[in-house]
Amino acid sequence: MASNTSRSAHLAQIITENTANIETYRREQGLPPLSLGPDAPLDVKYPPNVEKCRRAVIDATLELGELATGPVELRLVPGWAIMTMFGVTQFICDFDIARQIPLAGDISYEDLSKAINVAVPVLRQVLRAGMPYHMFYESRPGHVAHTATTKVMASESLISDWTSLYTDVLFPASAGLSKALREEPTASDPSKTGFMVTKGDGESGMYMYFEKHPEEARRFAGVMEAFQKDEAYAVRHLTDSWPSDSQTGKLVDLGGSTGAVAFALAEKFPGLEIVVQDLPGALEAAHVREGKNVSFMPHDFFNEQPVKDADVYMFRWILHNWPDGHVQRILRALVPSLKPGAKVIVFDEIMPPAGTLPLSIERYQRNIDFGMLTLFNSKIRDIVEWKEIITQSDQRFNVTGVRYPENSRLSLIEIVWQP
């Protein structure tokens, strides 16, 4: 491995060259220089070649900053930063600070204090703690205004929902993980997750908890909606990679909600007859569309599958939410209904081998994986784990193919029932 000095110089060069490419593109497009100031564009989408430069800058900056910080400070400083950012962010969410401050202009600490009923000295102390992390800034003495990162919380409801979710759900779940693992060392029970031991009241899992807490359920649904809008989770990745020999016949979409995926498949493959199954509450907003061969059926996928002899049974972005034992129960519930040669298609996340991704993407994937553990006692499985859990469910399940659509976070696992 190269010395830290040569590695540092190399990283600095990556940052310089790729930042120049990004700034050149922005100038050519009439965009301002990179900034988190109040007038900065909130969400710039780059073409693939420029996005590659952006990702290179992010990864090199992360690594170079940590090399310069050193091992001791890396263990001491982030804890303070995480504590501060969490506390300030929770304060911003709980008191709806982002919406109290005008999108254009500023507000005095005195007026903000009256609006939220928090004393000026304390209000100033909390907000100033967040300012080094780009949360608001003092536009003039005694006044506070938005940065781009707080403006988006006021103007984009999905961002606001996500921010509230990680202060009210994700952080408490993480804090409860150790306690949960002392109670359930195998992390196999959805009722004994970090989230459930921290916030639960005897429910069998997080979704049952949400049934009693509709506002938290609404925020969670909003965040899932935001994920679905991300290009990396676009439905077209599934339709484009759909097996050519499964474009006609009967398809059962388990956990298909209101049928967005089913209708996309029906549009592209009119020879499919699709049955969407989900719990009754999830189907309340579902509507049959004229001319589309899609129907809806209430069903709990832990129970025996009522649709017999379908050609394909599909789980899109479902099984990662469940511990291994529960995934096996879900798959075994299909068995009495499967005909020889029937397919099960799993379209879900597959964790790449450790250390093979760029640093920022590796951290993102591991963050999601850790979140699955703290919320559901589940995981983002690698392909070996997927194959093991499938064949352990029943040896007659045969994994016949795996497809990794370009630019998709979800991959397609094709399983054939061979009794």
Swiss-Prot record:
Its EC number is 2.1.1.-. GO terms for biological process: griseofulvin biosynthetic process; methylation; terpenoid biosynthetic process. InterPro entries: COMT-like (IPR016461), O_MeTrfase_dom (IPR001077), SAM-dependent_MTases_sf (IPR029063), WH-like_DNA-bd_sf (IPR036388), WH_DNA-bd_sf (IPR036390). Pathway: Secondary metabolite biosynthesis; terpenoid biosynthesis. S-adenosyl-L-methionine binds at residues 255-256, 278, 300-301, 316. The active site is at 320 (proton acceptor). It comes from the Eukaryota. It holds the Pfam family Methyltransf_2. One of its GO terms (molecular function) is O-methyltransferase activity. CDD domains: AdoMet_MTases. Disruption phenotype: Impairs the production of griseofulvin, but accumulates the intermediates norlichexanthone, griseophenone E, griseophenone F and desmethyl-dehydrogriseofulvin B. It catalyses: 2-(2,4-dihydroxy-6-oxidobenzoyl)-5-hydroxy-3-methylbenzenolate + S-adenosyl-L-methionine = griseophenone D + S-adenosyl-L-homocysteine + H(+). Griseofulvin is a spirocyclic fungal natural product used in treatment of fungal dermatophytes. Belongs to the class I-like SAM-binding methyltransferase superfamily. Cation-independent O-methyltransferase family. This is O-methyltransferase gsfB. It comes from Penicillium aethiopicum.
